[in-house]
Amino acid sequence: MPTINQLVRSPRKSRALLNKAPALQHNPQKRAVCVKVYTTTPRKPNSALRKVARVKIAGYGSEVIAYIPGEGHNLQEHSVVLIRGGRVKDLPGVRYHIIRGALDSRGVQNRKKARSKYGVKKS
């Protein structure tokens, strides 16, 4: 515990906030190119084959892993996608989501509810 005199000499420093999606460089979304599209398994209590893509962000070329939400997708290597921040809790290292229905990523087929999240037009 510092004395009042020590606090007068040098006040307390507030901790810097940690950026949860540093690859976006404070942008809401970024364009990226798929390098590899594959499936991976989630952490311990869950079991599935989650679809993810390793993407290279346009402009400065850092590579991150992005989750492909929804059932079925048309992404392959060299697909141009739009990524946003947002982690997937049961996939370690996945801190970005691919936005469905933007650029090369098609919206989810036969989606009736929560359409805006999966890039589906009103039918």
Swiss-Prot record:
An annotated Gene Ontology molecular function: tRNA binding
Keyword Membrane in annotation: no
Superkingdom of the source species: Bacteria
Protein keywords: Methylation, Ribonucleoprotein, Ribosomal protein, RNA-binding, rRNA-binding, tRNA-binding
Residues bearing the modification 3-methylthioaspartic acid: D90
InterPro entries: NA-bd_OB-fold, Ribosomal_uS12, Ribosomal_uS12_bac
Keyword Ribosomal protein: yes
GO cellular component, one term: small ribosomal subunit
Gene3D superfamilies for the chain: Nucleic acid-binding proteins
GO biological process, one term: translation
One protein family per Pfam: Ribosom_S12_S23
Its job: With S4 and S5 plays an important role in translational accuracy.
Family: Belongs to the universal ribosomal protein uS12 family.
Quaternary context: Part of the 30S ribosomal subunit. Contacts proteins S8 and S17. May interact with IF1 in the 30S initiation complex.
Protein name as catalogued: Small ribosomal subunit protein uS12
Organism classification: Bacteria, Pseudomonadati, Pseudomonadota, Alphaproteobacteria, Rickettsiales
